[in-house]
């Protein structure tokens, strides 16, 4: 621990001088462009306290840097790729096998409306994750679904787009309730082309 004694008159004068100064005495001689990646929510899953903490801290840093005159670009950086998507797709097929996404002979356009709600998604992922730990066949099928999605398989890409739309709408609402907003809504999937 650090023990420090401050003269109350000195502190009062210092704070009053700060209050009177432009931007509270903070100077930024050469503004910079700063990218801040915070939030880090996973799609199809509810936010937890760790996401809330990083969102509030990141939002505070963003606002301070903007106040200092820097250009700040904020990115939520979503967890929207990988095995979790394969798990969701595989569990969705178990629950709703008659959806056109699982009919290999289907050649039409995929529906614009998602075949699930955010509440269903938030229940599907933990169920699928638990199932993959005890059911090797299910786990392997999820790995194959992940590979197909990442290879551009149209039916799974359509499901993934639904997952993204439903999840991002919900995340924007929840982050908005915290007065947290992002300039970019990029995710792990944005690195896929590289």
Predicted regions and their residues:
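NTP-dependent nucleotidyl-transfer catalytic core
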Residues: 1-194
